[in-house]
Amino acid sequence: MVSGMICKAVVLVFGILYPAYNSYKAVRTKNVKEYVRWMMYWIVFALYTVTETIADLTVSWFPLYFELKIAFVVWLLSPYTRGASLLYRKFLHPLLSSKEKEIDDYIVQAKEKGYETMVNFGKQGLNLAANAAVTAAVKSQGAITERLRSFSMHDLTDVQGDETAETRFFPDGQKKPRASVSDSSGFSSLRKDSGDDRTDEDVEVNSEDEVYSQKGLRRSQSMRSVKVIKGRKEIRYGSLKHKPKKRPQLYF
């Protein structure tokens, strides 16, 4: 019994490689007789290949099936039997000559329908690709929107948490005091000096009012008020020194 692998190897070597080499020699030498011979062989072998494919699926279980295949290929190639030339001249050539016009029409229709089918498949493929791209874009946009929404809700939660903590530390609604720009080094010293000046002026006015209202005070009290007036701080405006006018001293 011959296995299927051995049959395939024999058909490959003697049915394809050997005829292909002889066809090359016929084309190179421009021998018309050999050229026609091998062209008839390839036509018959093409029909054999189609028949073999169908037979392998249906009658490969038949006894001596692979041996019959090898014998048929050898019969086609043998220069004594010339099986390929016999089959072509007796069967294939008359059949193809009678059906040539119909076969040509079928080939033209197949080309046109095949072209239209390919165009339709191409359009459908483009439409499917466009729909898939749009669907993917919409889904990605929805995912991005949900992500941004989750981020915004998280930020609002953080802000509410900060307000809760601030309310916890300042229950009366008082916010944490912040140092303003005006409380820097230069402005704070000027503000402090002006506060001292206003205090001295107020002391001066109050002391004078006390002097004029209470005439029966002792001399020591009047001297104390005069010392307060004399000890007033001088106000500076830039590089100039402002000296307040001295009031006449009152003695009792």
Swiss-Prot record:
Membrane topology, from the record:
Multi-pass membrane protein
Q: Decide whether keyword Membrane is in the record.
A: yes
Which InterPro entries does its entry note? TB2_DP1_HVA22
Q: Which domain of life is it from?
A: Eukaryota
Q: Keyword Cytoplasm: yes or no?
A: no
Q: Which cellular compartments is it found in?
A: Endoplasmic reticulum membrane
GO BP annotations, alphabetical order? cell division; endoplasmic reticulum tubular network organization; mitotic nuclear membrane reassembly; nuclear envelope organization
Q: Where is the signal peptide?
A: none
Annotated function: Microtubule-binding protein required to ensure proper cell division and nuclear envelope reassembly by sequestering the endoplasmic reticulum away from chromosomes during mitosis. Probably acts by clearing the endoplasmic reticulum membrane from metaphase chromosomes.
Task: Tell me which family the UniProt entry assigns to this protein.
Answer: Belongs to the DP1 family.
Q: What is this protein called?
A: Receptor expression-enhancing protein 3-B
Upper lineage ranks? Eukaryota, Metazoa, Chordata, Craniata, Vertebrata
